[in-house]
Amino acid sequence: MNNTIINSLIGGDDSIKRSNVFAVDSQIPTLYMPQYISLSGVMTNNGPDNQTIASFEIRDQYITALNHLVLSLELPEVKGMGRFGYVPYVGYKCINHVSVSSCNGVIWEIEGEELYNNCINNTIALKHSGYSSELNDISIGLTPNDTIKEPSTVYVYIKTPFDVEDTFSSLKLSDSKITVTVTFNPVSDIVIRDSSFDFETFNKEFVYVPELSFIGYMVKNVQIKPSFIEKPRRVIGQINQPTATVTEVHAATSLSVYTKPYYGNTDNKFISYPGYSQDEKDYIDAYVSRLLDDLVIVSDGPPTGYPESAEIVEVPEDGIVSIQDADVYVKIDNVPDNMSVYLHTNLLMFGTRKNSFIYNISKKFSAITGTYSDATKRTVFAHISHSINIIDTSIPVSLWTSQRNVYNGDNRSAESKAKDLFINDPFIKGIDFKNKTDIISRLEVRFGNDVLYSENGPISRIYNELLTKSNNGTRTLTFNFTPKIFFRPTTITANVSRGKDKLSVRVVYSTMDVNHPIYYVQKQLVVVCNDLYKVSYDQGVSITKIMGDNN
């Protein structure tokens, strides 16, 4: 060994007390044995809107503690005609609400969307929850007996505070009956389909078939001690209002803010959807592909099947078509002599005043080349130059035809309109499918009357992405970085006498062009506050809301 290294060790001061870094004293743990346990639930339709509810009762004299809940859901075979697919992560999106209760009341509960948000950085959990090409790609049935989707089972990891440190954080039963209750979303929230698919029949025949699994621990001579858990509480603001308030905030570990689109019952139809492939490019490619069949037409005369307001022109010899202040180059090879190439110059249009700015999707294409196939009667496109973005793909069809639009907005063919898709994904955030457009330009949080935090940039969103390793567009203020389980979490603490017992959030929405249809997508502000509770096991399992530093 090198002399310098040897001398650096020999010359060390032996009088200093040092910790052993080459060995540790092993401790004998509590005697326990874990087991995977599964059970069926009792199904009812007692939800707020006749939603399906599954209740799972856990009471076994040999189960001392439990954690790591997994919900199994069977998806049926889908047969019939039309286009159909399940939303990505369909298992999570089936869930509206989860609660864990004892005879003393609710111990912990969470909304389905917040459960999904908590698991968004767990790729394995997301994969098993129903993220596959078989489930999520849009499949087509051509006859009533066609199988559109094979039956499948998805597995939803229900992440709870009892999973943080395995045995330490597990929920101790304390000879109590524990009930896990899952409220499900309507079936319309979890499927993507076109108007030709018989959704009414599918909805009537669809039955949620869940099974709950968990890790149960049999423990010998268990010594149960009180612990702390964080319980999320969600407040949804009024439509298009920039404020939301969480009341009765006494000890909070974090506060999260995001926006959601509100489409209503008639605004959830869209032109395209990519299915399993969920990158921004996939959304844009799917949208462009849908538009091209209506945009460039090879025909032996003026194209038919379009509304009277459609402005379709024949492409001249030089291939250049002028649309207002823009030029589009079109070159289609192998066109038969008796046919011509046409360009649709007002495919989708929007404007709030005549003779002012017009948002025209046709103008967003600058060059289109391809080859016409006489055998298939279709054009194979080779090169498309365009400026279509994720916002364009996220515009509901209804906005093109809304009363705010002074133009005949949707000039597509009847055949194309029939392929539009109903998308009612309950967990979409922001105003576009990928939540890329940051529509909050300023955020202010008040605790009582005092300004707790304000920002003119997205720094709270950046920190949330860095700390959680997820990209869900949520802005989060975290008040607790204390290691879990072994310490009481740090909280922002109320002072009721001074009015400090509510968190008020106000945002300033980003400026958008009123002539862009996306401006009219309604939105809601969502605020999620994590309250701190103490779990006690004196007489069964019960929780107490922390009211200050001394609890």
Curated annotation (Swiss-Prot):
Keyword Membrane part of the UniProt annotation: yes
Gene3D superfamilies: Adenovirus Type 2 Hexon, domain 4
Key words, A-Z: Membrane
Cellular component GO terms held in the UniProt record: membrane
Biological processes per GO annotation: response to antibiotic
Induction remarks: Expressed in the early phase of the viral replicative cycle.
InterPro entries: Poxvirus_Rif-R (IPR005008)
Location within or outside the cell: Membrane
Pfam families: Pox_Rif (PF03340)
Topology class, membrane: Peripheral membrane protein
Main location class: membrane
Keyword Membrane: yes
Other notes: Displays structure similarities to capsid proteins.
Annotated function: Scaffold protein which forms a transitory spherical honeycomb lattice providing curvature and rigidity to the convex membrane of crescent and immature virions (IV). This association occurs concomitantly with viral membrane formation. Targeted by the drug rifampicin, which prevents the formation of this lattice, and hence virus morphogenesis. In the presence of rifampicin, irregularly shaped membranes that lack the honeycomb layer accumulate around areas of electron-dense viroplasm.
Assembly mode: Homotrimer. Self-assembles to form a layer. Interacts with OPG158 (via N-terminus); this interaction is necessary for OPG125 association with membranes.
Sequence similarity: Belongs to the orthopoxvirus protein OPG125 family.
Protein name: Scaffold protein OPG125
Organism: Variola virus (isolate Human/India/Ind3/1967)
Gene: OPG125
